Amino acid sequence: MSEQMGEQVPLRPLMRAKQNEEGKKRSIQHLSLETIAERLSGQLRGAQEDLCRPIVQQITRGKPVTPAALRSSLKASRPELEHRLARLPSDVEFDRAGNIVGLGVTLVPTSHRVQVGGKQFYTWCAFDIVLLPPQLDVEAQVQSTCPVTGQPITFVATPESTVLDLHPAGSVMSLIVPAERGDCTRATFCQQSLFFQSEQAAAAFLAEHPDALLLSVEEAAHLGRLVAESCSKDAT
């Protein structure tokens, strides 16, 4: 479990695996969670937080976001809202009626299932799961799937970045820190952030992604809180 806010958390070294020219040896680069959080928050920070936040909040209630509800929330005209929606990332999900059903969190099933307040939804990636509780001040029940073994990974994530009832206990999360803001898309960032049931299960992923980091779920939850706090400060 993580320590209280403001205190340093003793963490095992974060790993960055990189093969040499012969492909036989690996070098390990040590990065602090604070350094990773600073880089992540700078790249993940959106330019339309006042638009994205109500979308995320509504989806976590298990409901699509209608244009009418957004216009009311933002006090925006139809043309203004259409203009702003057009500026959202191209991977935002819409249903056939034109309602938003996915933006980081989604009503479209993925391998990352979340339950908050009795409402079920999904996320695009593992990092979205650990970012959500501190971002929205909620407790989340999580069930993900290891892409290698197909086995479930379950835990409870709290707003304070505490991880409860983790099973399997040695589960880890992969992460690739984007080099540029444009790299923070579902295809490039989200698809590389996964839960594995063990470091051994993640070995092949690390071999294929030499710039990937591997974190314990507790470390990942603490990182999620650091990023959420950073983005919140910048938004005020």
Question: Can you annotate each of these PLM segments?
Answer:
Residues 73-89:
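Short amphipathic alpha-helical interaction segments
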Residues 2-19, 121, 141, 151-236:
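Long, low-complexity, charge-rich intrinsically disordered regions
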Residues 59-74:
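Short acidic, hydrophobic short linear motifs in intrinsically disordered regions
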Residues 89-98:
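A short, conserved structural fragment
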Residues 23-52:
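Short alpha-helical segments that sit at the start of domains
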Residues 102-152:
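Aromatic- and glycine-enriched beta-alpha-beta binding-site module
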